[in-house]
Amino acid sequence: MEVQKIKPEPACYHAVNPEKLRTARFLERPNRFLVRCSLEGQDIEAFLPNPGRLWEILLPGTELLISKDGVREGRKTAYTVIAAKKKNTFILLHTHLTNDAAEFLLKVGKVPGLEGWRVAKREAVFGRSRFDFLLEKDGRRLILEVKSCSLFGERLAMFPDAPSDRGRKHVEELAGLAEEGVSGAVLFLVQ
C-alpha cells in the first residue's frame, strides 16, 4: 500500500508563540468550534479546534489560555483556544497541537512500547484514511493514530467524549490494515 503525504492547512497548523498567549474567562460555546470569552473585560470570540463536548471542562468562568493569531483570510476570529485550566492544571484543547506533543514524546523515547521508533511521516494516508504518524524502526513500519483524552475522573480516562465517526473509522481501518499485515497502534494522550 502506498503512503501519501497530505499538506496541512496553514490556518490550522502552527506553533504556539508564547508572546501571543493571553488568559481569558470562558462564557459560552455557541457551536463546536467557537467560544465566547472575556478578555481583559471585553467579550470576544475564539476558535476552538476541538469538536469534543468538553462539558466538564468548559464551565462559565473557566480560565482559558488563548493565542492572538489575528484575523486573516479564512479565519473569522482573531483568537484560538489553546488550553483550559482545571484544578491548577492546563488541559490542552487544541487538538492539532496534540500531535506535536506526541511527536516530541516519541523523539525523546517517553512513550512506553514505542521506544526506538522514529517518525517517518506525519499525516500518512493508508487505505481510505489519513493517520497521524508513520513510524519506522529496524526496517519495520507502524501506523500510529493519536487521540487526545480530555474526559477523565480522578483515576479514570475516557475516550471519546462524544460520538466520533472519524475515530471509529480510524480504528476500523487500522483493524483492516492489520489483517493485511500492516502494524498499527492508537496512542491516547491523557492530560
What residue ranges belong to the model's regions?
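Short aromatic-glycine-enriched beta-strand elements
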Residues: 31-36
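Conserved catalytic cores of phosphodiester-cleaving nucleases, focusing on short active-site segments
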Residues: 24, 131-161, 174
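Short alpha-helix capping/helix-loop boundary micro-motifs
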Residues: 44-54
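A short acidic/basic microdomain associated with nuclease active sites
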Residues: 110-126
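Short nucleic-acid-contacting surface segments enriched for D/E, G, S/T with interspersed K/R
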Residues: 52-65
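OB-fold/S1-family single-stranded nucleic acid-binding modules
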Residues: 73-88
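Short, charged beta-turn/beta-strand-edge "cap" motif at the junction between a beta-strand
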Residues: 28, 68-74
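Structural detector for short beta-strands of small beta-barrel domains
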Residues: 18-28
